Swiss-Prot record:
Lineage: superkingdom: Eukaryota
Subcellular location: Cytoplasm; Nucleus
The keyword Cell division is annotated on this UniProt entry: yes
UniProt cross-references to Pfam families, sorted A to Z: F-box
Keywords: Cell cycle, Cell division, Cytoplasm, Mitosis, Nucleus
GO cellular component terms, A-Z: cytoplasm; nucleus; SCF ubiquitin ligase complex
Main location: cytoplasm
Protein name according to UniProt: Antagonist of mitotic exit network protein 1
GO biological process, one term: cell division
Protein task: Negative regulator of the mitotic exit network (MEN), required for multiple cell cycle checkpoints. Required for daughter cell separation and chromosome stability. Involved in copper sensitivity.
Source organism per UniProt: Kluyveromyces lactis (strain ATCC 8585 / CBS 2359 / DSM 70799 / NBRC 1267 / NRRL Y-1140 / WM37) (Yeast)
Length: 424
């Protein structure tokens, strides 16, 4: 019986709660809100001043009724009720900021230099406006290497346009086939007094605009790669005032001929590296160019890829003049070069300081001398050499290599047998 009475009492209480909830939805909440008072302070959150709590006896029903967010209220009405409300704007000005309060770590030039090296030129320019220390570090990086390319031409030239002191050591134009007028307008803002490296990568419209610009005669590197429009006359006029040129890259400049090369040798006596590789108009570079280049005293790197009019005569000429100084030799695609030059020269242990030899697509069939030369360099001189061969040559090269090692092992066995027989 006790269990039945307990269940009945619980059911009656629940039914009473349901009735209250149905007829007065906020009655119990309002009652609790009525009794709640702000007269008792909590030390952690309650202000210590005198506060007016006139709303402490206000019911939650009244709060909901007087709230700006009325049920069914139109959005325009809601906006009108809030239009007088505004947020206080916090204005932060770099010009008025106190640098002395910033973290001292951001005033260490060496650390800033390491961080700034990861930024593009437009970001560097913004950093240069923060304070004098940042300006000095950013300027040193900008002035070291200025790269102008299609994807960021506006950002790069903004630096030139706004900074009157841009005098880079290296200036590179990368894949610019348009914007000639824009660049011509900004070019006078660049100072070329410290320039030692000038590079044009697939930018055919640019070299001609330097006709009216005085380039420093201290320029040591000039790259005009992928320019099919520049001719002998334009190139010669560009290099006339460059007596200290050391590195010249003319890859894929298909209009350049022997005439330019002879002029380069005359006006650039300090030249050490030249690349004449091409895929078109290969007949314009002949043995005459190599004969002229071999007269350069400091020549170390030569590239003739695709120049199929160059013959064994040129290789022998290079050997006679630069046997000990040549470091890199690329004759990829020079189909007239045969075993009569390369194989015979390495058999004499010629070019002992050569580090890279590219003989892809040449008419070579005797590789034993090259293999022995490579092993000799590695074992006795401790100067490894990288020999690049084409896929069509690889099979024959490996076959001759295996045969050579087999002969070597046979010779060792014969020597051991002879030694044993002599001992007995």
């Amino acid at each position: 019986m006790s269990c039945v009475s307990s269940i009945s009492s619980k059911r009656s209480r629940c039914e009473g709660f349901d009735d209250d909830f149905i007829h007065t939805p906020l009655k119990k909440c309002s009652k609790g809100y009525h009794e709640w008072s702000l007269s008792i302070t909590t030390p952690a959150t309650t202000p210590t001043g005198k506060l007016d709590y006139k709303r402490k006896t206000k019911s939650l029903d009244d709060d909901l009724i007087s709230s700006p967010v009325k049920f069914g209220t139109d959005a325009n009405v809601l906006n009108a009720e809030f239009q007088e409300l505004s947020l206080q704007k916090l204005l932060v000005s770099l010009s008025t900021s106190d640098d002395s309060k910033s973290n001292p770590i951001f005033h260490i030039p060496e650390l800033l230099h390491r961080i700034f090296n990861f930024l593009d030129h437009e970001s560097l320019y913004r950093c240069s406006k923060v304070n004098p220390v940042w300006a000095a570090v950013a300027s040193s990086i900008i002035n070291k290497d200025l790269v102008i390319q299609q994807s960021s031409i506006s950002g790069d030239l903004k630096i030139v346009e706004l900074d009157q002191k841009v005098h880079p050591k290296s200036l590179t134009f990368y894949k610019l086939k348009q914007h000639r007028n824009f660049i011509e307008n900004q070019l006078p803002r660049i100072r070329f007094t410290r320039l030692n490296s000038l590079n044009f990568y697939i930018s055919p419209v640019l070299p001609a605009i330097f006709d009216d610009v005085t380039i420093s005669n201290n320029l040591t590197k000039l790259t005009i790669a992928g320019n099919k429009k520049i001719n002998d006359e334009e190139l010669i006029s560009l290099i006339l005032g460059l007596p200290n040129l050391i590195d010249l890259d003319l890859r894929a400049c298909s209009q350049i001929s022997d005439i330019s090369i002879v002029s380069i040798v005359t006006h650039c006596p300090k030249l050490q590296s030249i690349n004449l590789g091409r895929h078109e108009n290969s007949h314009l570079i002949t043995d005459l160019s190599i004969m002229a280049l071999s007269e350069l005293e400091h020549l170390t790197t030569v590239g003739f890829s695709g120049c199929d009019k160059i013959s064994d005569v040129s290789i022998w000429q290079l050997y006679s003049k630069h046997s000990t100084t040549l470091v890199r030799l690329s004759i990829n695609g020079c189909t007239q070069i045969s075993d009569s030059s390369i194989s015979d020269i390495v058999a004499k242990h010629g070019f002992p300081n050569l580090k890279v030899l590219d003989i892809r697509n040449c008419q070579l069939v005797r590789f034993k001398n090259l293999i022995q030369y490579r092993d000799w360099r590695h074992k006795y001189l401790m100067k490894p050499i990288h020999i690049h061969i084409s896929d069509s040559m690889k099979k024959e090269f490996e076959l001759q290599e295996q045969q050579l090692y087999k002969e070597f092992r046979t010779r060792i066995v014969n020597d051991l047998n002879r030694w044993v027989n002599e001992a007995t």
